[in-house]
Amino acid sequence: MTRRIQVGAVPVGGGAAVSIQSMCNTPTEDVNATVRQIQRLEQAGCEIVRVAVPTEEAARAIPSIKAAIHIPLVADVHFDYRLALLCVDGGVDKIRINPGNIGSKDRVRAVADACRERNIPIRVGVNGGSLEKDLVQKYGGVTAEALAESALGHVRLLEECGFGDICISVKCSRVPVNMAAYELLHEKVDYPLHLGVTEAGTPEMGVLKSAIGIGGLLCRGIGDTLRVSLTADPVEEVVAAKRILQACGLRQTGPDLIACPTCGRTKYDMLPIAREVERRLKSCDKPITVAVMGCVVNGPGEASAADVGIAGGKGEGLLFAKGTVLRKVPEDQLVDALFEEIDKL
């Protein structure tokens, strides 16, 4: 088990529930726009949010943002250690840096000391795109070994400053390399791991890459917090993260829809019905499993674990619960009958 750190009110590692993170894409110095976006993220289920801090103006916006939100705030700082110190003074809940790119050891120590005094953890965040040139040369490219060695080198700088309140990420856009790097870290250290696939792309491909790269690790017991990085509205990152956690069996924050792929036994137009059920389930927050099946012969049995479901036939279908048929229903009333039953649960 990894050691536990505390990010504001959210525990990370040490057996705590895997938390969901996202990052704002607003200019941090635009406090109103940033707060509005964070409030939307909160409503979607985000539990930790990060903002970029490239300037002093952005750093000085931290207290105002922090005062207007309800989830822990992380400052993402590169190169200028003074920005990290300003964020610490501003009440940020976590700092993301790479100790190796903020200057001398004295500067690293200044950040570590400031964070220690206020019990603020630091995430060492390594990305494949900014990997040290000597490591790229040593390993012949961006490899899992290079990513892990980079992260461990940055961690060592903090440890030499007597700082151990650390979280680590090693993100790469190539899923197999990404996963292998996290596996190496999991073997070598007990710091909590922040999972993600960087530059995953637009939702269509990015969610798929993240589901494999993040979900594959979570199913093996690796990972303590996650961000799904998408070229999209950050709210979509949170929705995808919740779905990944649900698919991995780690969290059920709402209904789980299961539906068969259909075959030659299907006697009704199932796809529009499945889509309608999916649409209406978005307003349901019950942690239930709902099934839409293609035939009355196998449907109820195959979906016997579902709390409630429907299976279509020619002109009519079956409404069932836990594999037991409740009644026959005309095809055009199947969805309404299903939701009447859901309302009873």
Task: Name what the model sees in each region.
Residues 1-22, 116, 279:
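N-terminal amphipathic alpha-helix/helix-capping segment at the start of soluble metabolic enzymes
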Residues 15-33, 52, 71-79, 135-148, ...:
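Active-site mouth loops of central-metabolism enzymes
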Residues 18-24, 49-51, 73-77, 95-97, ...:
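Hydrophobic faces of well-ordered beta-strands that scaffold small-molecule active sites
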Residues 25, 30-31, 42-65, 96-104, ...:
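Glycine-rich, proline-tolerant flexible connector loops at the mouths of alpha/beta enzymes
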Residues 55-77, 110-122, 182-193, 277-281:
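Alpha-helix-loop-beta-strand connector modules within alpha/beta enzyme cores
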Residues 82-123:
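Hydrophobic or amphipathic alpha-helical targeting/insertion segments
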Residues 127-130, 135-282:
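Catalytic alpha/beta core domains of metabolic enzymes, predominantly
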